[in-house]
Amino acid sequence: MQNQRIRIRLKAFDHRLIDRSTLDIVETAKRTGAQVHGPIPLPTKKERFTILVSPHVNKDARDQYEIRTHKRLIDIVDPTDKTVDALMKLDLAAGVDVQISLG
């Protein structure tokens, strides 16, 4: 698998969960002899919602909610076969979305 790159994008609502998962991936890749670039923090997406509290009157009474989506990027350069096997066996938290692309 020479001259290849594995790009891993992680998304999560909890920043502690995503940091722990990136640390696990980086340690696993380095332990198997691959070169790692990252984790690179990508911009956090903030979604804000405003909801009326009262169903009839009191238009001024509103609640505001926010969801933050944290993202990280990890590049693994020149992965070995051991690296791919170890990453496949790696068990990550349930709240982390993982996208893997080969390039």
From Swiss-Prot:
GO CC list: ribonucleoprotein complex; ribosome
The keyword Transit peptide is assigned to this record: no
GO biological process, alphabetically ordered: translation
GO molecular function: structural constituent of ribosome; tRNA binding
InterPro entries noted in UniProt: Ribosomal_uS10, Ribosomal_uS10_CS, Ribosomal_uS10_dom, Ribosomal_uS10_dom_sf
Ribonucleoprotein in keyword set: yes
Keywords: Ribonucleoprotein, Ribosomal protein
Superkingdom of source: Bacteria
Pfam hit, one: Ribosomal_S10
Purpose of the protein: Involved in the binding of tRNA to the ribosomes.
Complex formation: Part of the 30S ribosomal subunit.
Family that this chain belongs to: Belongs to the universal ribosomal protein uS10 family.
PANTHER family membership: 30S RIBOSOMAL PROTEIN S10 FAMILY MEMBER
Entry protein name: Small ribosomal subunit protein uS10
Lineage: Bacteria, Pseudomonadati, Pseudomonadota, Gammaproteobacteria, Enterobacterales
Gene from which the chain derives: rpsJ
